[in-house]
Amino acid sequence: MSTSVSPVVRLVRGDITDQSVDVIVNAANSSLLGGGGVDGAIHRRGGPDILAACRELRASRYGKGLPTGQAVATTAGRLDARWIVHTVGPVFSGAQDRSALLASCYRESLRLAAELGARSIAFPAISTGIYGWPMDDGARIAVRTVLAETVEPVEEVRFVLFDAHAYVEFEEVLAMR
């Protein structure tokens, strides 16, 4: 059984594909075959090995796609990381509370990173782009889950945020912890 830890949490404004960490988390779509936003950037910068690994996963285990809230690891290709952990965030719905699925993305990514022996992990703000999740709520769920669910050997968690608005929202949540 893994031991819970209080990770060092860092906020970084920039491009997640520039991070030097053990695990980069990809906010993937269920096809695992690349898309827009973070997903597209990771596939473009990481090169064809990531897509090849994702195609193999689709053929062997995820024929219908990776379910929302789950996570799976592949090579990091040309990125300065050991692995990419792909997770599928929920599309925001004002009519249905899907926050448990969003928390599951962070929890399952952390669990998988720990199983892989990772000490550092970089997350984007999952579901806050095209999937429409409000940034303030997405930041609260992300930070709360990371603080509660990080286990050894993970020591450092980075939230890599593309714009100033996201950075400020995460900064405010971290200041209240």
Curated annotation (Swiss-Prot):
Highest taxon of the lineage: Bacteria
Database matches in SUPFAM superfamilies: Macro domain-like (SSF52949)
Matches recorded under InterPro entries: Macro_dom (IPR002589), Macro_dom-like (IPR043472)
Segments forming domain Macro: 1-177
One protein family per Pfam: Macro
UniProt cross-references to PANTHER family, sorted A to Z: GANGLIOSIDE INDUCED DIFFERENTIATION ASSOCIATED PROTEIN 2-RELATED (PTHR11106), MACRO DOMAIN-CONTAINING PROTEIN (PTHR11106:SF27)
Family the entry assigns: Belongs to the MacroD-type family.
Protein name: Macro domain-containing protein in non 5'region
Organism of derivation: Streptomyces griseus
